[in-house]
């Protein structure tokens, strides 16, 4: 867990709970752009989780992390080869079931536009690990009536045409804006 966490106090000014607001995930891999992005994001009040490249293991890892914390948001990243834009995924699919994200993605889109970041709104997260973790994560949240909003963002492989450093900075700033917004809505008293 990051050193900076939200501290909630009750009306008697006694410590209630300390937790991170946002979980950021990627898939493991030395050359996996999602892993590189995850390890370079610098945002307060976040936890990071690198998922194993396995359907079953990655599901277990995500569910265990969710069970141990009280996140407001989960932002998952995966690598999408042969593209130079971000792909904001709206749906996770499995068999004939489709789950739509409840994440406030219109604010994300507005943030991307405001920072001149090219993106695609996608309704197809693929049919491999990325889609599986997205679908299973949203299903777990739904089945357990958790108040967590999840989004999946595909990013290009690291290449000369894609300004990776700029994306790291912008995504870090976006996550900070999410956290700041929630600090006010929770009535946070202090940050440690």
Where are these regions (language model features)?
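N-terminal catalytic or cofactor-binding beta/alpha core of small enzyme domains
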Residues: 1-128, 138-149, 165-172, 176-192
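An accessory alpha-helical subdomain
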Residues: 154-158
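Short active-site-adjacent structural elements
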Residues: 159-163
